[in-house]
């Protein structure tokens, strides 16, 4: 790979490591710190199931790659595993030296490797017999015949036993078993009786380990260790498939996801080598699928950790605000007819968008509602409102993206439900994903004359649950050109060819040419002796062509600030990028908005929309970006970007070695914390 770019996957690991570092921040509530370990672990699980699984398929020749590509993929998997192993040491250090002592300060004691205290032994024994033992099903393992299938992302206990009384030379003396932990029946974390001021917790696997003699009478327990398998979860759809074929392929491949190829075998690193060798042979594990872990695996379960001590400082998040100008008795339609409206979630309530749809259901002059669906909540209020609109006589069209990873089943189910209610469903386009987050409400009077219509363009999904967790922005506008552009976009999704977009920037049509024009203009301004300025906020920056344009702008003297949460393949601080700074923000909410600023010689141009600057977004997806035309809303976005660039508590610089460099020494509560500062900024505007 060209050394002018960071490797995508190594850059992502740098981001995930930044997530882990939140667990060290002692200014945060303890259980919020614990939750960041859970997020880190969950992120890593998905990374292996998608990215590493793809590289492994290439490296093993499963994807019919040439020898050089296979070798490159194999080397990358090795590099990934080395970095993950390094991060494991940090995760263990933070958990054991920071989190567990902090829990103890609050009188919450985790039984770890040490034995259970005498005053809890009877409870642990009886709890095991009554609550756990009935759900255990030990399965013997042999090298010659594997009679157990290890399910994806399930925790197993591997046990080595010695048959009592068997001579040392007996081939049956040493036996191996595996057991799936039954925490669909029993919680992962068990609360033990309180003693004095102290609360006690125990992992379910540690309770099982303490009672192996009950499970295996007639055997001496040699040792036991946790293991887990991660399986390839990517779904590849034939680009040439038509709509009905896409539906069938998705249905079949979602079912096969649970039995996908192994991409990671995680094991307790304390396991003896001969024990590990036996399991590797028995389960036909490739050596490079081996990833050592801690004693306790599946640390994403920490999000379910009980908090028995109510005196522990709770996690307090800013509560979503409702704008007084959008009181439920007021019409969003009437407001937007007068002035564009910009909402920022989760600081503003997502109920405003639901209210917008609800008003469309009941407004007699509304004839049609059009929406894209990428990810929606289960039992979605958005979907239920659209169904109500169809039942109320409105024409409703929903584009459903079946290829939204891990949401395929939910999208299929909601599509079938909407179709049964009379909604016109458009399914995935062959060879493309539709990632745009847009909605359009069209009004006509009884005579068919067109009235004002309403467009909504967002950076986030129409999902009321993630709208409380992800930081996104969305624009309501009645601008007739934008409304007409959005109508053309929906026509394109229905098969119309050669659309023309005047204001909207749409990937695969006019987005790349317009981005190049905007960058060229900043370069030209700089050459004229004026100050070129670019600020780009996004989730990921990976496309080499656009990175090269930013390098070119930097070399011309354009000042560039990038606010990139995740993947960033651009290398700052080089001779070709000395005017580029990369800021990464990780805090309570997941930074998800895409907002772009071009200085334009003092008359700034601002945009928001759905795409990151990745190859897939810019060239293989339908994405929508809107200009912000209202001066007040422009200033609001400028202020948001300024606050984020001023963050000294949760923002760091990404340096030329992919290290997360704090902007100031931490912790300092008086420093700007952008998410909370922006919340206060918006609250003052209510």
Annotate each PLM feature.
Residues 1-534, 552, 556, 568-686:
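N-terminal localization/anchoring segments of enzymes in phospholipid and broader phosphate metabolism
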Residues 274, 544-545:
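Short alpha-helical
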Residues 546, 550-552:
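Polyanion-binding catalytic cores of nucleic-acid enzymes and NTP/SAM-utilizing transferases
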């Amino acid at each position: 790979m060209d050394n002018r770019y960071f490797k995508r996957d190594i850059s992502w690991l740098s981001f995930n490591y930044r997530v882990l570092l939140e667990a060290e921040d002692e200014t945060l509530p303890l259980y919020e710190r614990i939750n960041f370990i859970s997020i880190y672990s969950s992120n890593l699980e998905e990374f292996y199931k998608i990215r590493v699984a793809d590289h492994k398929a290439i490296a093993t020749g499963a994807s019919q790659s040439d020898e050089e590509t296979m070798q490159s993929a194999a080397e990358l998997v090795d590099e990934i595993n080395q970095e993950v192993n390094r991060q494991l040491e940090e995760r263990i250090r933070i958990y054991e030296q920071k989190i567990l002592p902090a829990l103890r300060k609050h009188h919450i004691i985790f039984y770890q490797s040490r034995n259970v205290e005498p005053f809890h032994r009877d409870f642990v024994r009886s709890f095991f017999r009554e609550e756990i033992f009935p759900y255990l099903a030990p399965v013997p393992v042999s090298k010659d015949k594997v009679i157990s299938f290890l399910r994806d992302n399930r925790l197993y206990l591997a046990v080595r036993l010695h048959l009592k009384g068997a001579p040392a030379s007996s081939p049956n003396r040493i036996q191996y078993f595996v057991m799936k932990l039954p925490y669909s029946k029993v919680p992962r974390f068990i609360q033990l009786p309180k003693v004095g001021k102290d609360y006690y917790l125990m992992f379910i696997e540690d309770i099982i380990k303490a009672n192996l003699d009950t499970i295996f009478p007639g055997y001496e327990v040699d040792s036991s260790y946790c293991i887990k398998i991660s399986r390839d979860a990517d779904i590849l759809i034939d680009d040439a498939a038509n709509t009905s074929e896409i539906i069938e392929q998705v249905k079949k491949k979602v079912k096969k996801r649970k039995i996908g190829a192994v991409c990671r075998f995680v094991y307790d690193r304390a396991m003896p080598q001969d024990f590990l060798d036996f399991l590797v042979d028995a389960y036909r594990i490739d050596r490079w699928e081996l990833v050592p872990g801690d004693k306790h695996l599946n640390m994403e379960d920490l999000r379910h950790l009980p908090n028995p001590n109510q005196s522990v400082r709770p996690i307090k998040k800013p509560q979503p605000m409702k704008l007084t100008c959008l009181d439920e008795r007021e019409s969003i339609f009437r407001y937007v007819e007068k002035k564009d409206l910009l909402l920022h979630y989760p600081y503003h309530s997502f109920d405003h968008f639901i209210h917008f749809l609800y008003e469309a259901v009941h407004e007699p002059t509304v004839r049609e509602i059009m929406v894209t669906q990428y990810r929606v909540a289960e039992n979605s209020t958005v979907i239920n409102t659209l169904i109500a609109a169809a039942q109320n006589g409105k024409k409703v069209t929903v584009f459903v993206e079946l290829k939204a990873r891990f949401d395929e089943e939910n999208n299929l189910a909601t599509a079938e439900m909407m179709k049964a209610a009379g909604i016109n469903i458009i399914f995935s386009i062959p060879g493309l994903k539709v990632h745009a987050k847009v909605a359009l409400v069209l009004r006509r009077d009884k005579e068919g004359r067109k009235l004002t219509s309403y467009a909504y363009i967002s950076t986030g999904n129409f999902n009321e649950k993630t709208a409380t967790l992800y930081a996104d922005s969305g624009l309501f506008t009645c601008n007739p050109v934008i409304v007409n552009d959005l109508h053309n976009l929906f026509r394109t999704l229905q098969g119309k060819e050669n659309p023309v977009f005047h204001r909207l920037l749409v990937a695969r049509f006019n987005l790349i040419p317009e981005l190049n024009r905007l960058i060229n203009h900043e370069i030209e301004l700089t050459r004229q002796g004026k100050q070129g300025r670019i600020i780009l906020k996004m989730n990921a920056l990976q496309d080499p062509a656009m990175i090269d344009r930013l390098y070119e702008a930097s070399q011309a003297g354009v000042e560039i600030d990038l606010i990139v949460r995740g993947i960033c393949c651009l290398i700052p601080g080089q001779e070709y990028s000395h005017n580029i700074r990369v800021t990464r923000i990780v805090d309570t909410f997941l930074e998800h908005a895409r907002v772009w600023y071009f200085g334009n010689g003092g008359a700034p141009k601002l945009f928001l929309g759905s795409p990151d600057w990745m190859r897939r977004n810019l060239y293989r997806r339908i994405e929508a970006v809107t200009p912000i035309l209202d001066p007040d809303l422009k200033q609001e976005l400028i202020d948001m970007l300024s606050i984020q660039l001023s963050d000294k508590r949760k923002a760091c610089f990404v340096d030329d070695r992919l290290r997360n460099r704090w902007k100031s020494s931490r912790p300092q509560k008086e420093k700007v914390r952008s998410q909370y500062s922006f919340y206060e900024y918006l609250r003052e505007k209510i």
